[in-house]
């Protein structure tokens, strides 16, 4: 929270800056790209508040639940989440996205986005999710190794197009399936080109701009058609509900609808696919755990089944940290962090901390029944006023897909050794795509 009184300002000015490694910024950025491996060493040497330089930004990584609470539940006028995002990704999502805006603009969008993600709306998506999951999983190869992640990418993309955008079989769906897939899989170098307009006339940056234009044209055409037809109230998809939503006479513009759709794709499609890929990988490598998960599916034990997915999210966080850009100087853990710094609330460090989770590297869903997993040491959807609105959607989607897998298959490893995490952009994925072998279950 910002400090305003003269005495508080004087006290804050006397606090030291956080400690951190004394190496060139380019080296720190390179090290931070392997933050899951370097953070334990940094914590050992510098504590839970660590100064780092990331992409030329002076930054701080915090590594305890208490400090994460200070950051994630801090005053929204001081901790800017939208401004903390990488500019290239901000440009693609749009300036009217719920994740790129801050303060009053964010609060307005959040109110308008609630209806499609409340409990009643989520229940309406269940049958479509089950149908899409069964269709994709029915095409899996049997008895031969394959990478689970591309398969999970395919089914979660189809859910985004059908459940979120509400596209039906036909030219609109065909026009967006491949472009959206390419948008998600584009390299960080291509996204970085979004902040250098001159690059967009050449090579991959030009193709990426053209790709975005095709997506935008298709989305705007779909939005205009829905508005003119006036049939959104009869459809159950997220886009139609957002078009129909009004709060105190306020509604989303076409540009804002476009920004939310692209944001939901980028923020919700690959993240769910990665979580499911890790879950399948871990079940394949632990037959006793898989037996329990299959029993939970067969007996309808939804609590244990959901705990399996939550434990996968804890053990393999897709995002290692979430960023906030400071608008005021703050005190954090006895240190002064100046305005303009980016503060990273560490999800990975807390979720793998033995002080928070007993035997943290073991896959143990039971920890979600003994009270050890809390709102501040299990953070896959963030926390505070910026907690992910789509968290319930992601959990329902994940359970629908995993349930179809385990109803139909037993899994075994596609490689002799478990896979490690590999950084791709800002997410962590299985190093070999989560290779598994599917064996049909006896009915």
Predicted regions and their residues:
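N-terminal membrane-proximal hinge/A-helix region immediately C-terminal to the signal-anchor transmembrane segment
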Residues: 2-95, 99-108, 123, 127-135, ...
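Cytochrome P450 heme-thiolate monooxygenase catalytic core
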Residues: 2-15, 79-90, 105-108, 121-274
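Conserved cytochrome P450 K-helix/beta-meander segment immediately N-terminal to the heme-binding cysteine loop
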Residues: 345-372
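Cytochrome P450 catalytic-core helices
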Residues: 156, 269-290, 294-296, 392-409
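Cytochrome P450 proximal C-terminal region
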Residues: 3-4, 12-18, 43-44, 133, ...
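Cytochrome P450 I-helix active-site segment
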Residues: 17-20, 25, 126, 130, ...
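Conserved cytochrome P450 K-helix E-x-x-R motif and the immediately C-terminal K′/meander segment
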Residues: 26-47, 221, 299-333, 354
